[in-house]
């Protein structure tokens, strides 16, 4: 099976900055024009955009005939085996446990069924992101910018083909964030807030069941509620988040017990997550894959421990201690390792979406072109520029936080994004793990671009007004001179 390689390509910071200035200027022009557009028109556009995203995702799924590879293969194999009472695949790793039931919801183990469901998740993600923009800023220009950006973000469609938790988990966690923002509105009745917090629990439970690492979002919400408590003395959110955590853990436990009902032995805890942390600290012997990337360490160690989670965890902890001792002796090597590990995850513009869905059975011509032809080259160039603009906007977003321009729940996406960044330091290195955090930060990035666009437009307006006033004064002085 072909491994995941990466290549270094130099980019122009100056060119990215120039494109960024042009985009900010366009946003500034849009800001004035969009004020005349009614809110319902943007809402209708968001619905149409969501439907378009669903259609495009389904169209790609039906035209690609994507085959299951790597983790996807194991997920599907485990689901099908468990349906026949074979527990071996599920026992290997606990996160497989969700997928037999995920596939069972559709009454089929066919890939296309799940891919089409995930395409629907892509449409829901777009619409919910639009509503998040409305909660964060209420700017119609920002809403339009977000809709365009999300529609053009190709990984959303590619991950509809990916039989794993990316599409469903990202969609669920975005829904949870939206409900969380509404629950923290200053207005609203108690029963309304209760329903919203219940929705947060439901969506976070689903997100956690599909992608455990999305626990980061719950932690960010707790930090946010502590900040709310310190600022406004409102404490109700913290007990609500305790209930949310209970639902998340109970949901995962329930799935495990449901799996045990189909097995002849206990489900077990699976491979301990510390194995992934230990693997993420290792130099990969395959230089083309980069440091901290997958090297079979986690499963090999777990198998050698005889599926004993405790013994495997002790081995991993020992390897982590050795690595930390080596870095303590050579801090420069540690910095170099971490720098390269972060770069191969955060500057890869497709976020592994093409790589993870590239195995296809008789794809249609346009799909083949998108993955291997000239369309692929154009897509990579576009996504590279897209990524540069997103990071530029994110930088502007954090600058606004530092300057005190953003307060309250507007800071939540920034806390989540930082949490995702720290996770990629600790975990196995793979740009796929960055994808959910890019989707979650896009609403704030759109708001940031629109904000600086308004600043630029206002500055240009003041300069133009000053020049016009100066000309008028000079003209009046000339007229006074002639009269005298």
Predicted feature locations:
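Extracytoplasmic catalytic/substrate-binding loops of multi-pass membrane glycan-assembly enzymes
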Residues: 61-78, 87-112, 268, 312-316
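Membrane-interface anchor segments at the N-terminal boundary of transmembrane helices
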Residues: 11-16, 112-113, 340-413, 417
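Transmembrane-helix signature of polytopic, membrane-embedded enzymes
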Residues: 129-154, 171, 407-413
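Loop-to-helix entry region of an early transmembrane alpha helix in multi-pass inner-membrane enzymes
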Residues: 93-97, 107-127, 144, 381-386
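Multi-pass, polyprenyl lipid-linked donor-dependent membrane glycosyltransferases
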Residues: 114-121, 145-175, 180, 207-217, ...
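Transmembrane-helix motifs of polytopic, lipid-linked glycan transferases
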Residues: 116-137, 175, 393-397
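Membrane-interface alpha helices of multi-pass inner-membrane proteins
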Residues: 147, 196-211, 222-223, 244-248, ...
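Membrane-proximal stem/loop segments at transmembrane-domain junctions that anchor or position
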Residues: 260-360
């Amino acid at each position: 099976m072909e491994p995941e390689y990466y290549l270094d390509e130099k980019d122009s910071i100056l060119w990215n900055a120039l494109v960024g200035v042009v985009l900010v200027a366009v946003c500034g022009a849009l800001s004035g024009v969009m004020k005349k557009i009614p809110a319902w028109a943007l809402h209708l556009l968001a619905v149409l955009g969501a439907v378009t995203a669903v259609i495009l995702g389904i169209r790609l799924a039906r035209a690609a005939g994507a085959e299951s590879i790597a983790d996807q293969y194991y997920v599907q194999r485990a689901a099908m085996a468990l349906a026949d009472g074979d527990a071996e695949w599920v026992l290997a790793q606990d996160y497989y446990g969700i997928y037999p039931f995920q596939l069972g919801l559709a009454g089929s183990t066919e890939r296309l069924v799940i891919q089409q469901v995930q395409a629907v998740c892509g449409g829901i993600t777009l619409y919910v992101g639009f509503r998040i923009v409305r909660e964060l800023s209420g700017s119609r220009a920002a809403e339009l910018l977000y809709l365009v950006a999300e529609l053009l973000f190709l990984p959303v469609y590619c991950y509809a083909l990916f039989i794993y938790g990316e599409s469903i988990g990202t969609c669920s966690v975005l829904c949870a964030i939206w409900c969380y923002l509404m629950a923290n509105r200053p207005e609203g009745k108690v029963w309304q807030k209760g329903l919203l917090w219940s929705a947060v629990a439901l969506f976070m439970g689903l997100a956690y069941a599909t992608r455990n690492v999305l626990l980061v979002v719950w932690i960010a919400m707790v930090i946010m509620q502590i900040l709310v408590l310190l600022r406004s003395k409102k404490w109700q959110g913290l007990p609500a988040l305790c209930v949310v955590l209970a639902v998340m853990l109970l949901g995962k436990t329930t799935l495990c017990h449901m799996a045990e009902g189909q097995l002849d032995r206990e489900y077990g805890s699976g491979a301990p997550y510390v194995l992934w942390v230990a693997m993420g600290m290792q130099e990969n012997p395959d230089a083309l894959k980069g440091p901290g990337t997958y090297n079979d360490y986690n499963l090999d160690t777990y198998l050698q421990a005889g599926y004993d989670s405790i013994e495997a965890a002790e081995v991993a902890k020992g390897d982590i201690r050795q690595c930390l001792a080596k870095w303590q002796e050579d801090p420069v090597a540690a910095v170099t390792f971490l720098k390269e590990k972060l770069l191969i995850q955060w500057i890869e513009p497709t976020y592994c979406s093409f790589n993870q869905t590239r195995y296809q059975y008789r794809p249609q011509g346009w799909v083949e072109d998108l993955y291997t032809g000239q369309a692929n080259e154009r897509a990579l160039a576009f996504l590279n520029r897209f990524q540069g603009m997103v990071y530029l906007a994110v930088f502007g977003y954090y600058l606004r936080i530092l300057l005190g321009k953003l307060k309250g729940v507007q800071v939540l996406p920034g806390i989540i994004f930082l949490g995702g960044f720290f996770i990629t330091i600790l975990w196995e290195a793979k740009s796929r793990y960055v994808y959910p955090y890019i989707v979650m930060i896009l609403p704030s990035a759109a708001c940031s671009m629109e904000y600086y666009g308004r600043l630029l437009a206002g500055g240009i307006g003041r300069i133009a007004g000053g020049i016009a006033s100066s000309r008028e004064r000079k003209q009046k002085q000339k007229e006074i001179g002639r009269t005298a």
